[in-house]
Structure formats: structure tokens, C-alpha cells
Design a protein with these regions (language model features):
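Flexible gly/pro-rich beta->alpha loop and the following alpha-helix that scaffold active-site loops
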Residues: 1-24, 30-42
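Active-site acidic short loop of glycosyltransferases
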Residues: 21, 85, 119
Length: 146
């Protein structure tokens, strides 16, 4: 909620939503692009009409936050151009976006969820491409080339 309050105070919320060039939100940036987040019960930017949920461990071995390497599957976005198999990327998060019409890649941790979103000129990743080695570099290069 603090981040959204800052964006509103600086009048950046409307500016971000009006951008026409490609925009990439990473981790919290992806969550802020959604409609609402259970983290702080915050209303967000609403670019993606979907809510952010908190992971609820279902088994003893399920740890929250989800930290570490995991795979991207069902990739279908320009961010993943050149991907021909499941790729590993790095995650650190306690909240997730359920699968929805904007899902650009899927990851499974506790349950399947959206690890990337895409709508118009807005792209978002729950994982950290900047911490994901050569795969992350390829994703960032693909974004720069949009």
C-alpha cells in the first residue's frame, strides 16, 4: 500500500497507465500493475484486471516466500522469443497472480500461477530477469527490442 500511496501522491499512477511505449514491471512491479493485492489490502493500478493473492502453504515442505529457481512453462509473449523449452528463472515472492487471460507464462509452486503477464504495451514478470543469468538477459534483450 505504501508504494501505491507514493505513486498516487506523485501522480505517477495515471501517467503509468497512459504510457504508450513498452513498460516492464518486475516482481512488485507486476503486482502493482494488477487490480488489487492482498499484501496490505491495496488497490493497485488496474492495468491487469486480476487480483494478487498470498501463497498459502498446503504441505509442510511448502515454504513462503518462494525463493529460488523455478521453470517457466506455456510461454507466449514477445518476452520469450527464442525459447524452445522450459527455462529456469529466479523468484523471491510471497504473493502470486492466478492464471488469467493475461498470463504470458506459467510457473508451479504450491499451485500453478502467472509468472508473467502481457496486455498491449504492458509486460510484467513475477520473477527477476536481472538475477536469472543468460535466460534473464535474453528476456531483457527481447523487451528492449520491442
Amino acid at each position: 500500500e505504501t508504494t501505491m500511496n507514493y505513486l498516487r501522491e506523485q501522480q505517477l499512477d495515471a501517467l503509468i497507465k497512459d504510457l504508450k511505449q513498452p513498460v516492464l514491471g518486475i516482481c512488485l512491479g507486476m503486482q502493482l500493475m494488477c487490480r488489487h493485492s492482498e499484501e496490505g489490502n491495496a488497490d493497485c493500478l488496474g492495468i491487469f484486471d486480476i487480483d494478487v493473492k498470498k501463497f498459502e502453504p498446503m504441505r509442510h515442505e511448502d515454504k513462503v516466500p518462494h525463493m529460488g529457481w523455478n521453470t517457466l512453462t506455456d510461454t507466449h509473449s514477445a518476452l520469450f522469443k527464442g525459447f524452445d523449452k522450459e527455462e529456469f528463472v529466479y523468484f523471491v515472492h510471497s504473493f502470486y497472480v492466478p492464471l488469467n487471460e493475461f498470463t504470458a507464462s506459467t510457473t508451479h509452486y504450491i499451485l500453478p500461477y502467472s509468472s508473467a503477464l502481457h496486455k498491449d504495451n504492458f509486460y510484467a514478470t513475477q520473477f527477476h530477469p536481472e538475477k536469472s543469468g543468460a535466460v534473464g538477459e535474453r528476456i531483457l534483450r527481447n523487451f528492449i527490442e520491442l
